[in-house]
Amino acid sequence: MAKEFGRPQRVAQEMQKEIAIILQREIKDPRLGMMTTVSGVEMSRDLAYAKVYVTFLNDKDEAAVKAGIKALQEASGFIRSLLGKAMRLRIVPELTFFYDNSLVEGMRMSNLVTSVVKHDDERRVNPDDSKED
């Protein structure tokens, strides 16, 4: 029987908290002027690699998102050294940052569903309009 919540998941959860604190307090890069949120961390089974998923507050500008990810990648060594001080791990994992667009996609899907429901309600109120198609 496999463990449902093994060591990689527990380390990832703690690492998510620590990286969020580091990004909030320690990183002073002007390319990260927008608020950065750590939405998730995935660890490899041997705890040597971590995929860090981040979102930005004003993520409408594609260039700003790419610049933010690039800034995080360039600061990954510094973040990794601070992680080593904050967490007692035998191996501090190599960090790779990715933009997490799941929240944006979720909001887009929610807006689509809302607009379809609204359009359907309008068609029920005015059934004559649908016969013109």
Curated annotation (Swiss-Prot):
PROSITE patterns: RBFA
GO biological process: maturation of SSU-rRNA
Pfam families the record matches: RBFA (PF02033)
Compartments, as annotated in UniProt: Cytoplasm
Family: Belongs to the RbfA family.
PANTHER family for this protein: RIBOSOME-BINDING FACTOR A, CHLOROPLASTIC-RELATED
Subunit-structure text: Monomer. Binds 30S ribosomal subunits, but not 50S ribosomal subunits or 70S ribosomes.
Function: One of several proteins that assist in the late maturation steps of the functional core of the 30S ribosomal subunit. Associates with free 30S ribosomal subunits (but not with 30S subunits that are part of 70S ribosomes or polysomes). Required for efficient processing of 16S rRNA. May interact with the 5'-terminal helix region of 16S rRNA.
Name this protein carries in UniProt: Ribosome-binding factor A
Organism: Klebsiella pneumoniae subsp. pneumoniae (strain ATCC 700721 / MGH 78578)
Upper lineage: Bacteria, Pseudomonadati, Pseudomonadota, Gammaproteobacteria, Enterobacterales
